Design a protein with these regions (language model features):
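RNA-contacting regions in translation and RNA-metabolism proteins
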Residues: 1-43, 51-76
Length: 76
């Protein structure tokens, strides 16, 4: 999941070297924290959060194939 999120985020932003993803495993859920450069935050979130919603949808659909529950947090 982490690699997929990195791939998606790096292709959306102007500064792909500033993209990082941190994994946090909970009891029943894996949380991925996405960090990007402040100037690229709008590109990852999108108008009215549409891009962020689609990123979360893609990651969740991939996680369902492996039977995992995943949430994506975009951290500034």
């Amino acid at each position: 999941m982490k690699d997929l999120l990195l791939y998606i985020a790096r292709n959306l932003v102007d500064d792909p070297d500033a993209v990082s993803v941190t994994e946090h495993e909970g009891d029943q859920e894996l949380t991925l924290e996405l960090r990007v450069a402040p100037d690229d935050m709008g590109k990852v979130i999108g108008r009215q959060g549409r891009i962020a919603k689609e990123i979360r949808t893609l990651i969740r659909s991939q996680a369902q194939r492996t039977g995992t529950k995943v949430s994506v947090d975009i951290v500034d």
